[in-house]
Amino acid sequence: PFHIGHLASTVIGHSLKMIHAFSGYNCVGINHLGDWGTQFGKQILAYKLWGDKETVERGGVDELVRLYVKFHAEAENDDSLNTRAREEFTKLEHGDEENTALWRWFVKISLDECNRTYDKLGITFDSYAGESFYTDKMPEQVEKLKESGLLKVDNGASIVDLSEYNMPPCLILKSDGSTLYPTRDIAAAVYRDRTYHFDKCIYVTASQQCLHFAQWFKVVELMGYDFYDKLVHVPYGMVSIDGAKLATRTGNVILIRDLIDAAVEKVAAVIDEKNPDLENREQVAQDVGVGAIVFHYLLNSRIKDTNFIMDDALSFDGSTGPYAQYTYARTCSLIEKAGDIKNANVTITEPSEAALMKTLSRFEEVVDAALRDYEPSTITRYIIDVCVSFNRFYQDCKILGAENDDVRASRVSLVKATNTVLANALPLICMKTPKKI
């Protein structure tokens, strides 16, 4: 299921795609689906033991999760279930008709659920080629490893020895011949190089996978592929709920759809109270509710561990998405009320005007820093700086009621500049820009 543990890779990845595109790169967003592996052996066995078609069709991904959690609970006391699950996955790898049909069904149910959430987040992908896409592309890479003399057999498993590089061996094939993550990742990287001829191939995953990426990046280099130095791993910190680690197998998750629904409901209540006649109320509630979640996620450095507390995510006080979107909407309102204003030289009469100009002038360097460091939070924190500077200017200075036309035109120009910066900056962190809230 799409839970908040998946939100980090989704929004960090999409933000980095937007930042690179804004900086002139031609970007391809890939959703590397985890649609292959021993977890499907567990899912298939759980379904065969405790599931039925009608219940899964009715319950969808929730029923699949229930079965998956039940498998792990039962396996705690019966290790033979793990052996049987591995056997089911081996059958799947060898093209077993029944298991292949079940696998396709489970993947479709999961992807349909994910796509509904992606739609709400406003995030799209150019490719959904997941792990299963590379099953027929792995033998070529395994053969290349054998021919190069890199592949060794250790206790029945096929490995690449990386002790020379102070790393554990990289496992390529299990003793039963089934593949592992590195096998699939190497095949995927080769395919992407041949298909896209990339300048960078960026992987956004949890920091627990740093060793995994270091290992197979090194294997790619040892295989002689010249794109090895274009592979970039962008790690992020662990996500927990009130200090408890997220895990689908235990059922300790908060589904993104539930979080979005709660946020949108809260925003809708605020709109009903403060601006009940607002046009497109439902869409604005959606944009601001989703924005509150995304902004909360991207406010801190990606490498920091996140203890996700629901009330904090949905708070509308302080450095939040709603505050940023409301500030943008305020600039839109002022520009609309100002009407046609002649171009004006900016006349500085108040310290807050100078401070706002200085903050706005940093936009280009902030984007460059975010690009260099693969760090969306650089943009997020800058947006807060802009909003704070603008609202201080708004409090200190009469804009539409300025003392003369030149000062009025000058201040409206500052409003327009703020509007332009926010209109460009907010989408870089997956945020919508409603003109009225």
Predicted regions and their residues:
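Non-catalytic interaction-recognition regions
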Residues: P1-I437
